[in-house]
Every structure is written in structure tokens, then in C-alpha cells.
């Protein structure tokens, strides 16, 4: 199978508010918009996309309808401290404070209006113990 595109789709009971959240706080733009589905593309990075879907829509098998759970969205950014300041000033909840992790991340965790966790990350050099676990092509510097 050759994958030509990959993006998460968040099932929600409020498509408009969820799409507005990602447009407002994460600089996404709607490239398709209906009352039951909005396809969002990053205004800063064309290969970054996200979609929002009415969790009760008929395209979802009946047994799977509802809202999302068990999902963590990771956004890698260049200036995690700046994004932290921006989102805190905008009133977003901080579920994990900004910190450096030995495994090679400076990050914090917030959430969208549906409770979907959002991890904002800046890769940093890992500790020596964790560096040995990376392949040479994936080691943050």
C-alpha cells in the first residue's frame, strides 16, 4: 500500500466550534467546510492537515459513532516556549506544564474543547541514556 495522505479526523458533537478552535489557535484554514465535516490544512505547512467530523454522521459505522477518546495529537514546533505563552494567554488549559524530558522533548500538553489532548513539542537533544535508543537518522540535535 502506498499512502498518499494521512491526517487525523476528530469526531465531535460540535463541528463548527472544534474547527474554529484549530483555526484560531493552531493556524489551520478550512479547505472544505460543511455542517458535518470540515477539512483543515495548516496555513504554515501544506502537508499538515486535520479534519473534524460530526460523530453521529452516517459515514461512521453505527457501532463507532460518538466522540473521540484515547487520542493525543502531537504538534512539533520551532518555538515551543512562544507557543506556550500564546496559548496560555488565550486561556487554553495547561494539563502538563512546559518541561524538558530526558527522552528528547521540550513540551507541554493542552486540550481542545472535546478533551482531545494536544502535545506541543520541540525536539531537543536527549540524555545519553535515551540517545542510545534512537536510530542515527532520528536523533534530535
PLM features: residue spans?
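Conserved active-site tyrosine of GNAT-family acetyltransferases
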Residues: 18-23, 87, 115
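Conserved beta-strand-loop-alpha-helix junction that forms the acyl-donor binding cleft
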Residues: 12-14, 102
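Helix N-cap motif at beta-to-alpha junctions
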Residues: 14-15, 78-80
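Vicinal oxygen chelate
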Residues: 1-6, 29-75, 84-111, 123-141
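Short glycine-/small-residue motifs
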Residues: 120
